[in-house]
């Protein structure tokens, strides 16, 4: 089973529990904290990967680091991953959980490629226009500057791409011209 599939299984189980308790956003914030610690402290994963360190010591390390900041359900999920030797799935669990919570709320992330950095106002306008097209209530816009676009925008929401860039228009024109010969 792939790492993403494993992380997703745990995320689904934790999300269902969070829904029952009415704490989906609380659990998301807690998992974001865990993810941030793992991403900013690469030594933590190195220590957890040590085969010579007993599993109970690894669990104790995480319990000492997180127990004061996490609800019992989130802490138990992390302990379960540790017991099963799946410490590397903890960060993936956080990402999968966030995706589930966003889907439930009708929120998606949009990557907007543009020639120049977009202002907050422009990001808000893009979110307002593309959220209904993507079937979402709200979009979080992440701007990526790409000078190869020449002009215009390219918006990616999940697997869908809306290409209004000059580069994209030139490519489509080229295909039409080649097909017409």
Curated annotation (Swiss-Prot):
UniProt xrefs under PROSITE patterns: ATPASE_DELTA
Membrane topology category: Peripheral membrane protein
Domain of life according to the entry: Bacteria
UniProt-listed SUPFAM superfamilies: N-terminal domain of the delta subunit of the F1F0-ATP synthase
InterPro entries associated with the record: ATP_synth_OSCP/delta_N_sf (IPR026015), ATPase_OSCP/d_CS (IPR020781), ATPase_OSCP/dsu (IPR000711)
A cellular-component GO term for this protein: proton-transporting ATP synthase complex
Subcellular location as annotated: Cell membrane
The keyword S-adenosyl-L-methionine belongs to this UniProt entry's keyword annotation: no
GO MF term (any one): proton-transporting ATP synthase activity, rotational mechanism
The keyword Mitochondrion belongs to this UniProt entry's keyword annotation: no
Entry coiled-coil feature ranges: none
Swiss-Prot/TrEMBL keywords: ATP synthesis, Cell membrane, CF(1), Hydrogen ion transport, Ion transport, Membrane, Transport
Family: Belongs to the ATPase delta chain family.
Subunit structure comment from the entry: F-type ATPases have 2 components, F(1) - the catalytic core - and F(0) - the membrane proton channel. F(1) has five subunits: alpha(3), beta(3), gamma(1), delta(1), epsilon(1). F(0) has three main subunits: a(1), b(2) and c(10-14). The alpha and beta chains form an alternating ring which encloses part of the gamma chain. F(1) is attached to F(0) by a central stalk formed by the gamma and epsilon chains, while a peripheral stalk is formed by the delta and b chains.
Purpose of the protein: F(1)F(0) ATP synthase produces ATP from ADP in the presence of a proton or sodium gradient. F-type ATPases consist of two structural domains, F(1) containing the extramembraneous catalytic core and F(0) containing the membrane proton channel, linked together by a central stalk and a peripheral stalk. During catalysis, ATP synthesis in the catalytic domain of F(1) is coupled via a rotary mechanism of the central stalk subunits to proton translocation.
Name of the protein: ATP synthase subunit delta
Organism: Shouchella clausii (strain KSM-K16)
Originating gene: atpH
